[in-house]
């Protein structure tokens, strides 16, 4: 059952900042989690960093925070596992619910949802690691090869030429069993935050 949190702007909250974990994005998450906890402290809240591990459920229950701030990147933090755990523990948290997280973390599932909504996206195919490394032409250049689940651009390779494609063998150990191969679309990356259905700010990268 989802847990809500009602509070006033001047309330002092006990907040557990959940970060770290075991995904390839662990270090990014730890750095972000510390900055978030520091910022919450400056706002007057009681914030503590919790590094996700096997004991985290017991730790969170003992802390009984007013809110869990999900600062995890990738893996269990974004695929719905952390959301499911926090639902079971009956703790209020930031982040999407289980279903939205699990779909959003999987780039292929996300594309199927986008297609059902009539939203355009780059041409793509899903290949095994062996197919990617076979040196066969998989798509007209340029294209992008990326993990199906993952973020922070870890494991992402933009391929502009045959020689760059052949160089992928150097990264063979880091490639996943199934990879997304996607048409390269040049442009500027922008992120827009949406809260309660309202856009609250856009950043350009």
From Swiss-Prot:
Its EC number is 6.3.2.4. The keyword Ligase applies. It is found in: Cytoplasm. It catalyses: 2 D-alanine + ATP = D-alanyl-D-alanine + ADP + phosphate + H(+). Pfam families: Dala_Dala_lig_C. The keyword ATP-binding applies. GO terms for cellular component: cytoplasm. GO terms for biological process: cell wall organization; peptidoglycan biosynthetic process; regulation of cell shape. Residues 111-205 form the ATP-grasp domain. ATP binds at residues 139-190. Binds 2 magnesium or manganese ions per subunit. Its cofactor is Mg(2+); Mn(2+). Keywords: ATP-binding, Cell shape, Cell wall biogenesis/degradation, Cytoplasm, Ligase, Magnesium, Manganese, Nucleotide-binding, Peptidoglycan synthesis. One of its GO terms (molecular function) is ATP binding. Pathway: Cell wall biogenesis; peptidoglycan biosynthesis. Belongs to the D-alanine--D-alanine ligase family. This is D-alanine--D-alanine ligase.
């Amino acid at each position: 059952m989802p847990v809500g949190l009602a509070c006033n702007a001047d309330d002092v909250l006990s907040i557990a900042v959940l970060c770290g974990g075991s995904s390839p994005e662990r270090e990014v998450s730890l750095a972000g989690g510390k900055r978030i906890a520091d910022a919450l402290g400056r706002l007057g809240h009681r914030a503590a960093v919790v590094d996700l591990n096997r004991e985290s459920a017991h730790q969170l229950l003992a802390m009984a925070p007013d809110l869990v701030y999900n600062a995890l990147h990738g893996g269990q933090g974004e695929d719905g596992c952390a959301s499911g755990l926090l639902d079971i523990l009956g703790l209020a948290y930031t982040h999407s619910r289980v279903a939205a997280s699990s779909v959003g973390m999987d780039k292929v599932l996300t594309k199927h949802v986008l297609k059902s909504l009539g939203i355009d996206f780059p041409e793509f195919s899903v290949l095994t690691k062996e197919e990617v490394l076979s040196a066969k032409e998989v798509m007209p250049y340029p294209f992008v090869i990326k993990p199906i689940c993952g973020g922070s651009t870890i494991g992402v390779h933009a391929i502009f030429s045959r020689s760059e494609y052949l160089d992928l063998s150097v990264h063979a150990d880091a490639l996943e069993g199934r990879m997304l191969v996607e048409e390269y679309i040049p442009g500027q990356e922008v992120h827009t935050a949406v809260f309660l259905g309202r856009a609250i700010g856009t950043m350009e990268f």
